[in-house]
Regions:
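Bacterial N-terminal signal peptides that target proteins for export
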Residues: 1-5
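Aromatic-rich carbohydrate-recognition surfaces in CAZymes
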Residues: 86-96, 162, 295-317, 374, ...
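Non-catalytic C-terminal accessory modules of carbohydrate-active enzymes
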Residues: 59-61, 68-72, 79-86, 91-138, ...
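Acidic/polar, glycine-enriched structural segments that form the non-catalytic walls/loops
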Residues: 21-27, 31-32, 40, 126-129, ...
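Bacterial N-terminal signal peptides
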Residues: 7-16
Length: 740
């Protein structure tokens, strides 16, 4: 009965238009399928499941199924030529044509790719398409759905329209290869029809190169679904080209296809799905520690569940799509948000699926582990291949926190463990916050794979940990006592560690060269960056202490703030902005991140570390110099400017724009009523990343004037754009959302 109801619901969708997601929003990024330049696309898959990407030129690549695979140059995005979409068209009176749906065959002017993640669309409306086709791609990346966000599945909803005056036969085929396979099987369950490309062997998988794929669709009285396997793609094309159907035969092949076929009357539109799912239960680090992927908690670990996953997708995709559509439209329909923000918020979410994301469901190689804990982490970038990087996730965790807060809390607990723990399945605590929780070689098994600098004496990490703990506790209702209890001892140790870094007795941590997230930038003495973060953390720690009933300690934190804050003012305030530091070669330099602590406290509903008047003056100084005089305000905010309005070129990082810290500046501006300035910064970054720089789906950490020397593609920090959303939500009442 459930399937009958869902089938009727889906059938009537063509008339009622319940699939609002089939309408491409104006905020979606778009590009001709045949356009020259960098090619990539929105991924499918789930957290920790590995991902598959259908690029904007119509090519598929599968390399990220091996979690952690990637490099700075993007060479891993090479296409698998056995994985393709095809379209068959035949008029009632006339010959059939078959199009391979990629740029090499179509060229320009035939199709347009669009993305507003988690949706992507391709609209085939050129002269080669008498039957017009539009496909909507998505995975169930549903906020606060901690089950389906793990699923290794993608949905391709094909909408075919016959605008001609005669009947047309139309068919869509997806060909695929299982790089780990040995044979194929036909599978059917009522109207659900599919092909499984089986894993090699019959035993339970023990390697990340053991698993299977499923291609499936939905048959009906008017829709015929066929499938087959073959020795090569050419054989599948030949069979499909004959009549738009496949032979329903399988053998010992690793390549196969599924196709649906329908006859369209003049003016008729239909919507038919193709599902792509996989089951590769194990992932492993370079040092061969193995982990079960999170989705296996909801199926099993046998590596034979791709058909079960596909069936669930066929049954529930209408519900998934509705929930995703409501999420997207709460953003796109919000009149408080500028248009650039609507696009950036969603499209920058790709990083959680393409950045080597682990989400484990237990150790698979005998290592000590709590299988119910579900550790989660992703890379800082491919060139800096550290997991979790705490100083960066301070900015780059806002999207995760705002959509899946329980996952973010687990990430923070891992860093709390780096300070203090008495667990047998963790490395010993360091007495200070770790930079990371391992690299691609040894994720989850060590602290501080980063050795470029000695991060154990950095001046920002401990303050950032306390602020993230407070954020995740306070902004989720201040009710999660288990989370606070788990992190509290580490917070106290972290606060004392920073207090010991005050060398001159003014209550502020003293920098001694390179000792914070800007790890090629010398800072000396009191600094607006680290000092401001410490002031912010004192106010957060006070609130945590009060929640724990430690009133004397709360008073201590307040007293430390009251003592240090006037020194922050007297040492760093120039009358217009806060100096970068007190002891470098030029303390009067203008650092864009000087009010990072102010922004965070405003975001958390805490008192500011400086007056609003001083904050506004400082942000205006940053806007006038670090933004407006950096490429004439065309591509973000440069890290450091000289007081005379020239770019500070004393280090590589002073003369860079960092995308993520630029978002922190914009968020701080919004919190202080400077929306016009934030809007200019945001628009410049949208244009840079998704237009002139061609950085789509690989947003870098940094670039220099005129977009020279981009660095660290696929970078973690850029999802700080969600902090800008949080800022708008804080200063404007939320509008009432009514589903269409």
């Amino acid at each position: 009965l459930r399937r009958v109801i869902l089938f009727l619901l889906i059938s009537t969708a063509f008339i009622t238009g319940i699939y609002a997601s089939s309408t491409i929003p104006t905020q979606a990024w778009s590009r001709d399928v045949g356009a020259s330049g960098y090619t990539d696309g929105a991924p499918i898959g789930g957290f920790g499941a590995g991902t598959i990407t259908w690029k904007n030129n119509g090519d598929f690549y599968l390399s990220r199924l091996d979690i952690g695979t990637g490099d700075e140059a993007g060479s891993f995005t090479a296409a698998n030529t056995n994985c393709k979409f095809f379209m068959y068209q035949k008029p009632a009176s006339g010959a059939a044509t078959v199009q391979r749906l990629d740029s090499a065959n179509l060229g320009t002017g035939q199709a347009v790719y669009n993305s507003l993640f988690p949706f992507a669309w391709v609209n085939y409306s050129g002269s080669r398409f008498s039957v017009k086709a539009k496909v909507t791609q998505y995975s169930p990346i549903i906020p606060e759905d901690y089950q389906r966000v793990s699923y290794p599945v993608g949905v391709y909803e094909w909408e075919l329209t016959n605008p001609t005056t005669q009947n047309y036969d139309a068919a869509i085929m997806l060909t695929w290869e299982n790089p780990y396979g040995s044979s194929a099987s036909l599978v059917t369950d009522g109207n659900y029809t599919g092909l499984v490309l089986n894993k090699a062997g019959t035993g339970t998988p023990t390697l990340e190169t053991q698993g299977e794929f499923c291609l499936a669709s939905l048959s009906s009285a008017n829709v015929t679904v066929t499938r087959m396997s073959a020795a090569n793609r050419a054989a599948l094309e030949t069979d499909f080209s004959t009549d738009g159907a496949l032979s329903n035969t399988v053998g010992s092949n690793t390549i196969g296809a599924v196709a649906f076929k329908v006859t369209l009357a003049p003016g008729q539109t239909v919507r038919i799905p193709i599902i792509l799912s996989w089951d590769i239960p194990i992932t492993q680090s370079q040092y061969n520690a193995k982990w079960y992927r999170k989705y296996t908690q909801h199926f099993n670990r046998l590596g034979t569940n791709s058909w079960a996953i596909a069936r669930e997708a066929l049954a529930d995709r209408a519900v998934w799509e509705q929930k995703l559509d409501e999420w997207v439209h709460r953003i796109t329909d919000n009149p408080n948000y500028p248009e650039w923000l609507k696009s950036m918020l969603l499209n920058e979410m790709y990083i959680y699926f393409t950045a080597g994301t682990y989400w484990e469901a237990g150790g698979a190689s005998g290592q000590a582990d709590n299988p119910a804990e579900n550790m989660f982490s992703h890379l800082e970038s491919y060139i800096y291949d550290f997991y979790g990087t705490s100083d960066v996730r301070f900015y780059g965790s806002w999207a995760l926190f705002m959509n899946w807060p329980e996952i973010d809390k687990q990430c923070i607990k891992q860093f709390a463990d780096s300070v203090y723990n008495n667990r047998s399945d963790r490395p010993a605590g360091l007495g200070t916050t770790a930079h990371d929780i391992g690299s691609r070689a040894d994720v989850f098994t060590r602290w501080n794979a980063y050795v470029y600098r000695d991060s154990t004496n950095w001046k920002d990490l401990n303050s950032k940990l306390v602020l993230m703990v407070y954020r995740d506790w306070h902004l989720t209702g201040r009710t999660d006592s288990d989370f606070l209890d788990y992190c509290w001892q580490s917070c106290k140790i972290a606060m004392e560690k920073t207090a010991t870094q005050d060398a001159d007795g003014d209550g502020l941590p003293d920098s001694n060269g390179i000792d914070q997230t800007y790890d090629d930038m010398d800072l000396t003495g009191d600094t607006s960056y680290c000092g401001g973060l410490y002031l912010a953390s004192l106010l957060a720690a006070k609130e945590l202490a009060l929640a724990k009933g430690e009133t004397a300690l709360a008073q201590t934190y307040q007293e430390r703030f009251d003592f240090a804050q006037p020194n922050f003012e007297s040492q760093l305030w120039t009358g217009q902005y806060y100096k970068i530091d007190t002891g470098s070669h030029d303390p009067t330099r203008i650092m864009s991140d000087q009010l990072c602590g102010q922004w965070y406290n405003k975001a958390l509903g805490l008192p500011g570390i400086v007056s609003d008047a001083n904050a506004v003056s400082s942000f205006q100084k940053i806007y006038d110099n670090n933004f407006a005089k950096f490429g004439n305000g065309s591509h973000g905010v440069v890290n450091v400017m000289n007081a005379n309005g020239t770019i500070d070129s004393t280090s590589s990082q002073t003369e860079e724009c960092w995308v993520g810290t630029s978002w922190g500046v914009a968020a701080g501006m919004v919190h202080h009523g400077m929306e016009a300035q934030a809007d200019d910064i945001g628009q410049s970054l949208l244009n840079t990343i998704w237009n002139t720089g061609q950085y789509w789906f690989r947003t870098p950490e940094a670039f220099r004037i005129n977009l020279t020397m981009p660095r660290a593609m696929y970078y973690m920090r850029a999802t700080a754009v969600w902090a800008v959303k949080h800022a708008y939500d804080s200063v404007h009442p939320a509008p009432t959302y009514t589903p269409s």
